[in-house]
């Protein structure tokens, strides 16, 4: 009897031990799955933040609420996504064809009066001659009179059904040529938008770390997908970030120089890439009546008020005639050397941006001979430039903007900062003027980088106006650039998106706008660095704002 009892106890212990062991095994397996799910959720969230989008639609773990800046970025991107929806295509023949599309002048006349509006109805078709049922084509309208060195942009209204209304204001008399270029079909524009926002790796940044007589280069970037130790260069307030692989035996503070090069990567398919061959970019759509005659008709021009900051230029905001830029929304004065000298007396002028503003600081001494460069003992073309006229107490300074700054040349990172931080350092007063431009160097990167910077600049200007409302701030939009370049990285479609974003973000600020996009279309320059006569007219517009 006692042996049976002992046997039963032994069996009970063995069964209990087996049950407990089985339960531990099951729990451990489920915990592993749960931990894997959590880890997957974290990695997906990080990837969405760093490589695709700041705003993942779903997440398996609670996320921190979006900041005000992140919400604004999200809102702007959602609006742009609606304007540039996916346009997949099975064959190039189903994309927009300049040859098969028709442009018809509405209510045509033998002659027109100066100041009239001329409208063109554009109906787009594909290469098979079929009517397109949606819009989104990237078009450029321009009128010109080469004999008069005259030009102006046209306004394009997209009805999103395959038809467009193209409007020209006839600003001058004479024979006028009309041009309507298909820069990219809607399918190409959609592909560029998708490809742009897919990755940060189209540009390779190489940082040079210097420690005494030794130096080493490491890879850097706006994001880095690496398990190696990183140097983090963060601006928490404006949510800006830049990273470098940490070199051995050197501190992160030893980062002194930077250079970039293009990475051989594309997010376009072969079929999409075929839309950007040289022969398919910037194709003329006006085939029949290209020339019209415009007479004066004794029309009087309205006398507008003088140009002031806070005015919002229409499109077009002016035109060029005999090489001079003439605004249509304010009475702009053509300043001679004497007036320029008087205007600049006692002024502190800060040019913050890229090389299209560096052109300004090279131009000033050609007109104002008393302005001389002051040697700051820096090297390279991207160093800080300083012009001084001690007698008239005039100072003009140019500084490049911070990352991303794309160039094969090695540039210094000493005294190198984001534009919002540069603005924060300026006390400002009625004799201080700031000119800001950025965008060309942002084109190869996802759009959230540009939007975040624009919002940071907007907030810095608002802070400046709180402490010094009399300071003049001027925003210069991007120039159009070469049509036949690396379209995926640097094409003007990306610049046009920047143009729309800048207008939206800065619309409520009391700033002056130099619409270089409109101006360079009117001049027909098609180069990132336009010639001196264009730079001179941009500067003349600036001086009208501050004098």
UniProtKB/Swiss-Prot annotation:
Glycosylation, residue list: 39, 211
UniProt cross-references to InterPro entries, sorted A to Z: Ig-like_fold, Ig_E-set, NXPE4_C, NXPH/NXPE
Compartments where found: Secreted
Keywords from the named record: Glycoprotein, Secreted, Signal
This protein's record includes keyword Glycoprotein: yes
Official protein name in the record: NXPE family member 1
Species assigned in the record: Homo sapiens (Human)
A GO cellular-component term linked to this record: extracellular region
Signal peptide interval: 1-21
Gene: NXPE1
Domain of life (superkingdom): Eukaryota
Cross-referenced PANTHER family: NXPE FAMILY MEMBER (PTHR16165), NXPE FAMILY MEMBER 1 (PTHR16165:SF3)
Record-annotated membrane-spanning stretches: none
Family designation: Belongs to the NXPE family.
Chief site of localization: secreted
UniProt entry tagged with the keyword Transmembrane helix: no
